[in-house]
Swiss-Prot record:
Organism: Geotalea uraniireducens (strain Rf4)
Name of the featured protein: Holliday junction branch migration complex subunit RuvB
Region named Head domain (RuvB-H): 255-338
InterPro entries, alphabetized: AAA+_ATPase (IPR003593), AAA_lid_4 (IPR041445), DNA_helicase_Holl-junc_RuvB (IPR004605), P-loop_NTPase (IPR027417), RuvB-like_N (IPR008824), RuvB_C (IPR008823), WH-like_DNA-bd_sf (IPR036388), WH_DNA-bd_sf (IPR036390)
Broadest EC class assigned to this enzyme: hydrolase
One Pfam family linked to the record: AAA_lid_4
Length: 338
């Protein structure tokens, strides 16, 4: 199922994000704590003419990890080489990337938690000592030589920090968690994006769109493009609150930002499993979706906003979920006295 509000990046997102992406920390909206810390670390590194310490960015998808990696390179005045964990299959792949870096360059690895153990072993000395261990020959005659690397900055991004091995995580000097955005921050981002794309948007239209964007800039920008299409064909081209409401009604995105899949998850727990607790794999089987996708993509927003609880016994729909769908909230079971 194709989701308009999935925080995962799509081909359309990749094409347009380059246009909308800020290039400097001062232009980056939100994430004030992470941004403030990075400003200090970047200014200090530039003042000493050193490479920035390695940076780990983690949090739900669509919150700006890739954007921050590019901003770090721009602020440091260096080049950035971007790749992802699944692409680096063999140690030789990583060695080829590392040996092509220049002094102080940024190496950005998205989905860094998906690096294989063998590749990680090559990365440890590269991060810590800026050396690459290369094995020449095979068997008893094999020997290891150390190749010096330029001092570089590794920026790793992950949605699942818990899957990182401790040795890898401990080698990052800067670790920042990105949080969901406020409606006010998203409205500012939407207004800025509309201006860049040459759209006219009213304040109430931006606020309504922000409210339904699930705290995620990537979703906000995607909704903006879909509402722009609606405004062009069904209205006078100006994005107002009424235009946003009508457009998102057609896309089946409700006032909380829920789409069909969110409703399916919560209603399955409520209607089929008595509100829970129910195991993740059981939910996945009931709605024909992958367990990892539910856990990484759908659940964070539902949990953050109090519609779902994750317990040791399984997932439980909250009172807010029952009320949102007009269901009667069940009475808590009465404990036995004897």
């Amino acid at each position: 199922m194709t989701r308009t509000i999935t925080p995962s990046i799509t081909d359309d997102d990749a094409l347009i994000e380059a246009t909308l992406r800020p290039r400097a920390l001062d232009d980056y909206v939100g994430q004030e704590k992470a941004k403030g810390n990075l400003r200090i670390f970047i200014d200090a590194a530039r003042g000493r003419d050193e490479a920035l310490d390695h940076v780990l960015l983690y949090g739900p998808p669509g919150l700006g990890k890739t954007t921050l990696a590019n901003i770090i390179a721009c602020e440091m005045g260096v080049n950035i080489k971007s790749t992802s964990g699944p692409v680096i299959e063999r140690p030789g792949d990583l060695a080829a990337i590392l040996t092509n870096l220049e002094a102080h360059d940024v190496l950005f690895i998205d989905e860094i938690h998906r690096l294989s153990h063998v590749v990680e072993e090559i990365l440890y000395p590269a991060m810590e000592d800026f050396q690459l261990d290369i094995i020449i020959g095979q068997g008893p005659s094999a020997r290891t030589i150390k190749l010096d690397l330029p001092k570089f900055t590794l920026v790793g991004a992950t949605t699942r920090a818990g899957l990182l091995s401790s040795p890898l995580r401990d080698r990052f000097g800067v670790i920042s968690r990105l949080e969901f955005y406020t409606d006010e921050e998203l409205a500012f981002i939407i207004t800025r994006s509309a201006r860049i794309l040459g759209m006219e948007i009213k304040t109430d239209g931006a606020a309504e769109m922000a409210r339904r964007s699930r705290g995620t800039p990537r979703i906000a920008n995607r909704l903006l493009r879909r509402v722009r299409d609606f405004a062009q064909v069904k209205a006078d081209g100006v994005i107002t609150m009424k235009v946003v409401q009508d457009a998102l009604a057609l896309l089946e995105i409700d006032e909380m930002g829920f789409d069909q899949m969110d409703r399916m998850i919560l209603l399955t727990i409520i209607d089929k499993f008595g509100g829970g607790p129910v195991g993740l794999d059981t939910i996945a089987a009931a709605i024909s979706e992958e367990s990892d996708t539910i856990e990484d993509v759908y659940e964070p927003f539902l949990i953050q906003n109090g519609f779902l609880n994750r317990t040791p016994r399984g997932r439980v729909a909250t009172k807010a979920a029952y009320l949102h769908f007009g269901r009667i909230v069940p009475e808590p079971p009465q404990g036995k006295l004897f």
